[in-house]
Amino acid sequence: MTALVGAGGKTTLMYALARRMADAGRRVVCTTTTKIFPPEDGLPVVLLEGAADPVAAVHDALSAAPCVVAAGRPLPDVRKLDGVSPRMLAVLSTALPEALFLVEADGAARKPLKAPAAHEPVLPEPLGCCVAVVGLDSVGQPLDDGHVHRSALVCAAAGQEPGSPVTPATLACLVEHPEGLFRNCPAGCRRLVFANKGDGPGALDAASEAAALSRSVAWFAGSAAQGWCVPLTAGAQRALGMEPFRDLPC
């Protein structure tokens, strides 16, 4: 399973990766351990709460479509889908080994940057890869709750004062800090950073500067909405087995 954590485009990246994998012939299950917005492009949604046999429900859906969204139940008050428990995801991934599971494991209140609270992220098991997403549009914004989710925790991780601007060093600190974006990520799990919204002015320069300060993981920058990315670190291309062209990682 692959988990997406952080802020600034997790859901968009998840669905973009899913489309790419489905186009390549894979069977893909998009899901969450928290809450997500329903897909906008007509992907089938499988509701597991109350299902007599959740494994059969997902299996049958994948037999009819290469990519599906698995969720607990609709949440009409917030126009989202409720998540699936890590325990159920373990059951599903074991029973459906041919499927690729993409799991949004974090919430960010639609902010471009965050630090996890004590109960976050809600990671599934077994976890093979964890992708931390940061929004490059956060750079230059003040570290306050109007612009950053859990800004006090970001300040603590980055050693900055409240209200000070987000910098590339802030992003690097969130990646490297033990209580940062990869909090509770298991040993042996591959760790990648996707710096999203790289189409903005100066965004790729900011991402490159952050990657240079954070050498323990592979960094990519790009635009999930536009469907491209570039590797920023020497290990990034090797980590994802991709050529250095403007495309989403697989």
Regions found by a protein language model. Give the residues of each.
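Feature captures the catalytic cores and cofactor-binding loops of soluble hydro-lyases/lyases
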Residues: 4, 12, 36, 84-87, ...
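Short, ordered loop/turn segments at secondary-structure junctions
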Residues: 7-8, 33-36, 106-107, 135, ...
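Short amphipathic alpha-helix with an adjacent loop that forms part of the alpha/beta core around
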Residues: 55-62, 240-248
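General beta-strand structural signal in soluble alpha/beta enzymes
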Residues: 4, 28-32, 70-73, 101-105, ...
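N-terminal phosphate/diphosphate-binding loop that engages ATP/GTP or pyrophosphate donors
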Residues: 11, 18-73
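N-terminal glycine-/serine-/threonine-rich phosphate-binding loop
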Residues: 1-17
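A generic structural motif
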Residues: 32-33, 217-229
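Conserved catalytic-core segment of NTP-binding enzymes
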Residues: 79-95, 100, 106-218, 231-235, ...
